[in-house]
Amino acid sequence: MKKIIFATGNQDKMREIREILADIDAEVVSMKEAGIHADIVEDGSTFEENAVIKAKTICELTGEITLADDSGLEIDYLNKEPGIYSARYMGEDTSYHIKNASLIERLNGVPDEKRTARFVCAVAAAFPDGSVKTVRGTMEGRIGYEEKGENGFGYDPIFYLPEYGCTLSLIHISEPTRHAQIS
């Protein structure tokens, strides 16, 4: 059976990717499961560049097909912040409750039509022959005025989806379905 390495140490992401790739004929393993302990510097200027950096680094170390992702939140009014720094916005140890409160405060007084935002996810696949493929998906919405909902994670409680009339945290959908909606 073929092996695909998913370049993450995040067990929630591993669970999600295994659900998404359940129908392929390959064993999907994490870096830890593959015995890889690499501290990869994500110094790209786009989500795609960061995903490629991770995928190529691990593929070159192992000779195995490697998938990697980079994702985050872009808020148009804030010049697409926090963008590629979404996880590190206000510091990696800062809770998302505090990060969300900060973003809401920064948008204080900004009308609905200027609170447009999107979740972005870029995935890179690096192959042993040196080739790399990337794909980018987005989910459009707005930033709400307060946190709402307990489901999801990160910025989900402030990411308002007008077509559903609620935040992403209030929508009860499975993770693979959630990712499939990013197109």
Set out the residue ranges of the language-model regions.
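Single conserved hydrophobic/aromatic residue that forms the stacking wall/gate
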Residues: I171-S183
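Anionic-ligand binding patches
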Residues: K2-I5, Q11-L170
